[in-house]
Amino acid sequence: MTSNVNISVRSLVEYVYRSGSIESGFRTSRALTEGTKAHQKVQKQYGESDQHEVYVSAEIPYEDLLFVIDGRCDGLLMDVDGVTVTVDEIKSTSSDIGQIEEDSYPVHWAQAKCYAYMVAKDRGLSRMRIQLTYMQVDTEATRRFVVEASSDELEQFMLDVVERYYPYAQARYEHELGRNQSIKELSFPFPSYREGQRKLAGAVYKTINEGRKLFAKAPTGIGKTMSTLFPSVKAIGEGLLQRIFYLTARTTTRTAAEEAYSLLQAGGFNCKSSRSQRRRKSALRRKCGARRSIVSSPTAIMTELMKLCSIY
């Protein structure tokens, strides 16, 4: 039986083309905030026949897995001949745009080529033009690089990307099978629920199932941590969630969450976890010789957590 691997183009290429350093000009919270504006400024220059934010997808079978890959290309440009199609991938940066060369960021080319493959396959095109457009957010200066590729070359490129991603996808799939089985067999870690605990746990699961938000106020001592963590874990086993972020403002509440997680593990729960903390405390501990991840803002925290939690 073939199992599906659903993944976005960006997630796929960022894994395959990952490197040991991160270019801050593309990763800061400021760049993320201004990125949308930069994209819109470039897209306003498009012609009447051009399109922006075009959804594309493809299904690629490989070994025992079916890769369902999708994304949105920033621009789909039509040449004056009405035949040549260009995929435009826009990247905004706060760095010096003059320092960016054609081969500076292979991951950007990979993303654009994946989109080009999908467009060529969907429209039956034998050749595609691929363009990277960089915009400096302060000066609004732009720099473009253009290459061309045949549909056969793009197909081979796409297959190579999938082949390189496959070992991780297979390992993750096998892990998820074991994880979900452990969740199915997982029991509540206490002999009985405290007063109000079952009601809160039920509300948490229902909220997750309905894709809504829950704000709960409960007295101290009813077991709020386990009442939220346990149903959330069960929701992962049902395919309703992929990951859980448990954010706390104090060390004591963080410890409570870690202890609750340990109880679930002792009951057979098989899942990966990681911990990250704010810059100030991390920096203080770093001076004492301890190694910690250093993050500085809610956006940075979420980005760091997403990188750390590669298998769930």
Give short role names for the model-derived ranges.
Residues 180-181, 187, 240-312:
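A substrate-engagement module of RecA-like helicase motors
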Residues 209-231, 242-244:
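Walker A/P-loop
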Residues 153-185:
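Polybasic (Lys/Arg-rich)
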Residues 205-206, 225-240, 260-264:
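Walker A/P-loop NTP-binding motif
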Residues 1-79, 83, 106, 110:
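Metal-dependent nuclease catalytic cores that hydrolyze phosphodiester bonds in DNA/RNA
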Residues 174-217:
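Conserved pre-motif I regulatory segment
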Residues 58-155:
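Mg2+/Mn2+-dependent nuclease catalytic core
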